[in-house]
């Protein structure tokens, strides 16, 4: 069996899982509801607040799907019960971030401001402290959507390796390059 796929998933208090109905599993919790398509080769069983996944055959593809869908369902359960957060740090002189409605207003050293529209499923906060780099906090129940939005924001100003200026995840280590040495 798949090492990850064979592990049972414990349902926390207040979280319900139903399905698969027409190959879709629904997870509902205090923070919201999520749904996920499940391949017909994978079966989902729910017993005593424990979810287990089984596969029909031992084909290589089915083994991969077994682990994949177990992790996706586990992420859905964590999302609707506690949620996910990602923080981005804006490193650079004059870099600013503010929230205006459902848009993130960014000043990233370009000649123009950047307005990044945030999906309604994601909550965003901009934090500016004097003497520190501005931070953008993203929060949501869908881990995949949250990561995708954070990655898109990060691509608006990629971190350059010489001075380390740009948008990075909070706590991310950047490989720095040495600049050219002056020749005599």
From Swiss-Prot:
Function statement: This protein binds to the 23S rRNA, and is important in its secondary structure. It is located near the subunit interface in the base of the L7/L12 stalk, and near the tRNA binding site of the peptidyltransferase center.
Entry keywords, A to Z: Ribonucleoprotein, Ribosomal protein, RNA-binding, rRNA-binding
Biological processes per GO annotation: cytoplasmic translation
Source species taxonomy: Bacteria, Pseudomonadati, Bacteroidota, Cytophagia, Cytophagales
Protein name: Large ribosomal subunit protein uL6
InterPro entries: Ribosomal_uL6-like (IPR000702), Ribosomal_uL6-like_a/b-dom_sf (IPR036789), Ribosomal_uL6_a/b-dom (IPR020040), Ribosomal_uL6_bac-type (IPR019906)
Organism expressing this protein natively: Amoebophilus asiaticus (strain 5a2)
Superkingdom, taxonomy of origin: Bacteria
Record has RNA-binding as a keyword: yes
GO MF annotation terms: rRNA binding; structural constituent of ribosome
Pfam families listed in its UniProt record: Ribosomal_L6
GO cellular component, one term: cytosolic large ribosomal subunit
Quaternary assembly: Part of the 50S ribosomal subunit.
Family: Belongs to the universal ribosomal protein uL6 family.
């Amino acid at each position: 069996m798949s090492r990850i796929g064979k592990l049972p998933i414990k349902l926390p208090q207040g979280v319900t899982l139903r399905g698969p109905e027409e190959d879709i599993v629904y997870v509902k919790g205090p923070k919201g509801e999520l749904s996920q398509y499940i391949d017909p080769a994978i079966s989902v069983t729910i017993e005593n607040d424990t979810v287990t996944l089984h596969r029909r055959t031992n084909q290589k593809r089915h083994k991969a799907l077994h682990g994949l869908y177990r992790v996706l369902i586990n992420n859905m359960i964590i999302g609707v019960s506690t949620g996910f957060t990602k923080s981005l740090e804006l490193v650079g002189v004059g870099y600013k971030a503010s929230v205006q409605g459902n848009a993130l207003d960014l000043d990233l050293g370009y000649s123009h401001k950047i307005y990044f529209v945030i999906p309604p499923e994601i909550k965003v906060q901009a934090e500016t402290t004097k003497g520190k780099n501005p931070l953008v906090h993203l929060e949501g129940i869908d881990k995949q959507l949250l990561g995708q939005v954070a990655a898109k924001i990060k691509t608006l100003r990629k971190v350059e390796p010489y001075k380390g200026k740009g948008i990075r995840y909070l706590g991310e280590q950047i490989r720095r390059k040495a600049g050219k040495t002056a020749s005599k």
